[in-house]
Curated annotation (Swiss-Prot):
Known role: This protein is one of the two subunits of integration host factor, a specific DNA-binding protein that functions in genetic recombination as well as in transcriptional and translational control.
A cellular-component GO term for this protein: cytosol
Alphabetical list of CDD domains matching this protein: IHF_A
An individual GO BP term: DNA recombination
Name the UniProt record assigns to this protein: Integration host factor subunit alpha
HAMAP family associated with the record: IHF_alpha
GO molecular function terms listed in the Swiss-Prot or TrEMBL record: DNA binding; structural constituent of chromatin
Organism field: Rhizobium leguminosarum bv. trifolii (strain WSM2304)
Pfam family, one: Bac_DNA_binding
Family from the record: Belongs to the bacterial histone-like protein family.
InterPro entries: Hist_DNA-bd, Histone-like_DNA-bd_CS, IHF-like_DNA-bd_dom_sf, IHF_alpha
SUPFAM superfamilies for the chain: IHF-like DNA-binding proteins (SSF47729)
C-alpha cells in the first residue's frame, strides 16, 4: 500500500489536468458530483457507478449485543447503515495491481 490519501483537492486537480476546465470549475464539478451522490444516499436511494461500485443504505433491526468486558447483554437500537460494494471491474483492477506489485518486488535470483 502506498499510504496516500486522495482528497477532493486531488480529484479537482486531476479533473483540471485531464478535462481542461479551470481549477475553480474543476473543484465545483467535484463538489457537485459528491453532493449529488451524498444527497441520493441520504434519501435512501442506491447509487450505482458502473465499473466502480454501488452505495446502498440498509436498515438494521434492533438486536441484542453483548458488552465484551462484562458479558452483559445490551440492546442495540435499529439504525441505517451505508454499504459499499466494489464492482467486479474494480475488484479485478485491484487484484491485477496487487499481482503486478508482488512481481515487481520479488527478489531476482542471479543467473548461475
Amino acid at each position: 500500500m502506498t499510504g496516500k490519501t486522495v482528497t477532493r483537492a486531488d480529484l479537482a486537480e486531476s479533473v483540471f489536468r485531464k478535462v481542461g476546465l479551470s481549477r475553480t470549475e474543476s473543484a465545483e464539478l467535484v463538489e457537485t458530483v459528491i453532493d449529488e451522490v451524498c444527497n441520493a444516499i441520504v434519501r435512501g436511494e442506491t447509487v450505482k457507478l458502473s465499473s466502480f461500485a454501488t452505495f446502498q443504505v440498509r436498515d438494521k433491526n434492533e438486536r441484542i449485543g453483548r458488552n465484551p468486558k462484562t458479558g452483559e447483554e445490551v440492546p442495540i437500537s435499529p439504525r441505517r447503515v451505508m454499504t459499499f460494494k466494489a464492482s467486479n471491474v474494480l475488484k479485478t483492477r485491484i487484484l491485477k495491481a496487487h499481482v503486478a506489485r508482488k512481481v515487481k518486488l520479488k527478489p531476482q535470483n542471479p543467473a548461475s
